[in-house]
């Protein structure tokens, strides 16, 4: 069967950016920036994106493009006879399934809140009533399961229509709409009374605040966010590399994806901080920011129903773009592993992913258990821990070693592939850092994640 190709360079960049852009850009980055010294945190974050995220992304793209295979078979196409690098391909697929086991549920939350806000069901509620609306959603397996199934059915339907006619076409529209909505929301926030104070807190470097949090904590936080924001390590980027031609060098393409991801993260802060300072609300992170703090603000804002609806539509698009990208990876891997066509792989995964996502849905209600407290309190937190603390850092380390070690694909092969085409090039003077320095940083992120979870 002939390998499918993306129709355009824009499609490749928007698909890859859609995979990287997710809810963490909104519910984690602005909070970390605010607490970590504003502009000081942002500067360190940008530095770590360049020295940490960019090289590994280019390696995933290179492995995909050189092999023209999904992550499960890419290593086999490139490794030397008798080597075992391909084992990671199976772990990458498991990591993608694990990620979707909870991400489909969270995407469902965004869809539910878009409906609730657009229908006016959150308008005029008190702060306590807004908080209880979120609690009631978590306590209802029916509501959570319904929206999770909507997300899975929509995403599988898009992927089943094919690479160009389904995934690329829908993602282009979704990503352009996402970016447009963000700009509209940010402009609205900039005209709020507390905008100047909020932007000062967010963007002006404040090293005194950075010292209060701890310089080391801030640096590690910036490093972790720069690493995890790009969804590296489970082959979700490699699959899109396998769908493109050799016209453009891959480091330059990686820069474009990272710039889009960073634009969304920084613009999210432009939306959130002016609103929080205008309405005197403490800026929080995670689900409490998205489902309690911001709905409270929208409930008290002029035209709050409109702005709230736009915000949750943006969040739904951000979540769905990631779901679509990872579903494509899963479907393509299963097509190659099981020798299925796209439609059969899509149908099988429709039922499989719904079944695998149910524990996350039920973990907040029928299957709630105190034993999950060490991970954060629910099945979702355990699944998130496995993906974020194990599969992403260790998977990134495997890609890194495979591309730089003489026992893997090797530096010369990687450099030849990544530099093929027009654009920014990888040079030999980078070899020492990428071969010896970067693996140490990734190992540190892995070790610190375990320490922070179990020992801190």
Regions found by a protein language model. Give the residues of each.
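Loop-to-transmembrane helix boundary motifs in multi-pass membrane proteins
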Residues: 5, 11-13, 19, 145-146, ...
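Transmembrane helix-boundary motif of multi-pass solute transporters/channels
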Residues: 11-48, 235-236, 241, 251-255, ...
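Inter-helical loop and helix-membrane interface segments of multi-pass membrane transporters/permeases
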Residues: 3-4, 32-36, 66-91, 104-164, ...
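Membrane-interface "cap" regions at the ends of multi-pass membrane proteins
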Residues: 1-27, 56-61, 65-87, 245-249, ...
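C-terminal membrane-solvent junction of multi-pass transporters and transport-like membrane proteins
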Residues: 88-91, 338-350, 382-442
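Membrane-embedded translocation segments of transport machinery
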Residues: 2-6, 168, 172-320, 324, ...
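Select transmembrane alpha-helical segments in multipass membrane proteins
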Residues: 5-16, 41-44, 83-97, 145-151, ...
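Membrane-water interface regions at transmembrane-helix termini and the short interhelical loops
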Residues: 32-36, 84-100, 135-137, 150-174, ...
């Amino acid at each position: 069967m002939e390998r499918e190709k993306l129709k355009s360079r824009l499609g490749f960049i928007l698909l890859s950016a859609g995979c990287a852009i997710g809810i963490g850009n909104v519910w984690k980055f602005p909070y970390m920036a605010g607490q970590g010294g504003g502009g000081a945190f942002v500067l360190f974050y940008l530095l770590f994106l360049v020295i940490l995220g960019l090289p590994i992304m280019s390696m995933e793209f290179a492995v995909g493009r050189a092999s023209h295979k999904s992550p499960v078979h890419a290593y086999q196409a490139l490794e030397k006879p008798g080597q075992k690098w391909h084992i990671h391909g199976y772990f990458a697929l498991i990591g993608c399934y694990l990620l979707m086991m909870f991400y489909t549920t969270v995407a469902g939350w965004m869809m539910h809140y878009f409906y609730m806000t657009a229908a006016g069901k959150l308008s005029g509620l008190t702060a306590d009533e807004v908080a209880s609306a979120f609690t009631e959603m978590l306590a209802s397996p029916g509501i959570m399961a319904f929206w999770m199934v909507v997300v899975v059915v929509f995403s599988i339907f898009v992927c089943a229509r094919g690479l160009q006619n389904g995934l690329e076409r829908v993602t282009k529209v979704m990503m352009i709409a996402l970016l447009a909505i963000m700009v509209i929301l940010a402009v609205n926030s900039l005209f709020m009374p507390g905008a100047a104070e909020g932007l000062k807190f967010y963007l002006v470097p404040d090293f005194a605040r950075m010292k209060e949090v701890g310089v080391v904590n801030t640096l590690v936080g910036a490093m972790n966010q720069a690493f995890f924001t790009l969804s590296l390590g489970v082959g979700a980027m490699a699959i899109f590399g396998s769908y493109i031609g050799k016209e453009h060098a891959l480091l330059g393409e990686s820069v474009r994806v990272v710039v889009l991801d960073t634009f969304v993260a920084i613009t999210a802060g432009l939306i959130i901080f002016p609103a929080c300072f205008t309405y005197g609300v403490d800026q929080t992170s995670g689900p409490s920011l998205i489902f309690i703090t911001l709905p409270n603000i929208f409930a008290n804002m002029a035209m709050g129903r409109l702005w709230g609806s736009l915000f949750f539509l943006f969040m739904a698009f951000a979540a769905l773009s990631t779901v679509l990208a990872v579903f494509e990876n899963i479907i393509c891997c299963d097509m190659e592993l099981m020798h299925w066509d796209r439609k059969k792989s899509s149908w099988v995964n429709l039922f499989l992913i719904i079944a695998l996502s149910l524990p996350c849905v039920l973990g907040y209600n029928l299957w709630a258990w105190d034993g999950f407290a060490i991970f954060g309190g629910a099945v979702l937190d355990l699944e998130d821990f496995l993906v974020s603390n194990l599969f992403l850092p260790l998977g990134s380390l495997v890609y890194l070693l495979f591309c730089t070690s003489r026992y893997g694909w090797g530096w010369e092969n990687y450099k030849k592939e990544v530099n093929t085409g027009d654009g920014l090039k990888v040079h030999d003077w980078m070899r020492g850092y990428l071969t010896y320095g970067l693996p140490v940083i990734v190992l540190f992120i892995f070790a610190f994640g375990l320490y922070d979870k179990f020992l801190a």
